[in-house]
Regions:
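N-terminal intrinsically disordered/low-complexity leader segments
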Residues: 1-8, 190-216
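Hydrophobic alpha-helical segments that form the core
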Residues: 94, 141-184, 194-205
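Helix-turn-helix
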Residues: 12, 16, 20-58
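Amphipathic alpha-helical segments used for helix-helix packing
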Residues: 84, 93-118, 147-152, 159, ...
């Protein structure tokens, strides 16, 4: 049978699960419902995923691992910290904005506190540490508080999408990144330069594509 999404059976399952988890919640969604939405038998689902938890883990890590990869690259890049921070904020916000089913809204599901999701939490910690390092370099002291503020701003797009699905667009990530620089006391003049240089950094990322220009 042809894949409904063109992503293969595993991709079909993730696509269906993302939609159902976001609409109904994790606990209220059965593997039977996921399989039915993916166009396969429930027994076939277990050839690709051992459990519903594994499906959720794949979805959650997919919202973080690309940003972690970007953060690693930016930390090793020779450029002003403010520009690298802008680039990371814009990339991270874009990933959350463009996620089809707003999977980031599942971060606070109580099931995610389980040890099974340690890989996801480890990625989140690494991403937070990358933000903290860039903020220290860009703003000096007060890194702990500022890191939480910046991450809160970036991830606010999750709630914005939930409240008003049409309230975010291709310009939102750049606006979020601009706002993050103001939170860490970057001056208006330096912020403009950081925006320009950060946009250049995004386009030059090895795993970027030309569509990144949409957030500039």
């Amino acid at each position: 049978m042809e894949s409904p999404t063109g992503l293969g059976t595993a991709g079909d399952v993730l696509h269906a699960a993302g939609q159902l988890f976001s609409a109904r919640g994790f606990a209220a969604t059965s593997t039977h419902a996921i399989a039915q939405a993916a166009g396969i038998r429930q027994a076939s689902l277990y050839h690709y995923f051992a459990s519903k938890n594994e499906i959720l883990l794949r979805l959650l890590t997919g919202t973080v691992s690309p940003s972690v990869e970007t953060a690693r690259t930016l930390l090793a890049t020779q450029a002003p910290a403010s520009a690298r921070l802008w680039a990371l904020c814009a990339w991270d916000a874009r990933l959350l904005v463009e996620d089809r089913f707003n999977v980031g809204s599942l971060y606070l599901q109580p099931e995610v506190d389980d040890d099974y999701f340690a890989e996801f939490h480890a990625l989140r910690r690494e991403l937070r540490e990358a933000y903290a390092r860039l903020i220290i370099d860009a703003a000096g002291a007060r890194a702990a508080v500022l890191t939480d503020l910046v991450l809160g701003l970036v991830e606010s797009v999750i709630l914005l999408r939930r409240r008003d699905p049409g309230g975010v667009d291709a310009q939102t990530p750049g606006l979020v990144a601009d706002g993050a620089l103001r939170l860490v006391f970057v001056t208006e003049q330096e912020s403009s330069a950081a925006h320009r240089r950060g946009a250049e950094l995004l386009i030059s990322l090895p795993h970027a594509d030309r569509s990144d220009v949409r957030i500039l």
